[in-house]
Amino acid sequence: MKYFKGEHLSYDCVVKDGRMLYMEIFKGHVLRDGMFDFWETVTHEVGSAQINNIVNWTAANLSGYTGCSCYETISDNMIEAHLRMGDIDRFMNRTLMQSIVKLYRDGSWEYQEKEYRKYYLFAVFAPYTQEVNINKKLLDQAEKDCVFFQLDSSDGELANPPAGKRIFALGTWDRDVGVRIRNKLINNINPPIPDEYVLPLYGYKSD
């Protein structure tokens, strides 16, 4: 098995009979050992050659398929392909979700993006053996301040990497807001998450 190094991208797509209707591209900022610091949308920053590779692969391999698809690449090498949505549901865009439902239901697509905005999806990981307690008021405030907020199961049964389980994920249109909320939650977790999981995080500052 080859080991790839380089830029990790996730392509969140909607297709009809293999024809690309919609594409959003996320860039993953790696933490270590399969864990990620955060993802950000880079759709308008990726070169046309890379995008065309995905479009052409989809047309060649999904010619009879209509619906969501998701691909992951490292340095232009495709490492995963799924017939499902990736992370675009975390935009909390009702119009987009309704358009996808309509595509599945009757094959029509009407969605038009009014304005492109950068989106950031932050995560926090901890050791599998760690119990995590977070003040409910802080969780409620985070849910209010974020576009998307998800507190993950404490048993770590999600598809987590070997080195740690994800504690929560939050999404915002403003990177600084995401950093601030994440730092606030991290610094109020009891017992504290080990430094090796939090010190390398983008923008992390202890209280």
Regions found by a protein language model. Give the residues of each.
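Hydrophobic side chains in beta-strands
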Residues: 13, 75, 124-126
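ATP-dependent carboxylate/phosphate-activation module, predominantly the ATP-grasp catalytic core
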Residues: 12-59, 81-117
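Domain-scale recognition of functional cores that engage charged ligands
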Residues: 5-8
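Active-site flanking residues adjacent to catalytic metal/cofactor-binding acidic residues
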Residues: 1, 71, 79
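A short glycine-rich, hydrophobically flanked beta-strand micro-motif that places a catalytic Asp/Glu
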Residues: 62-76, 170
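A structural supersecondary motif
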Residues: 69, 84-87, 147-154
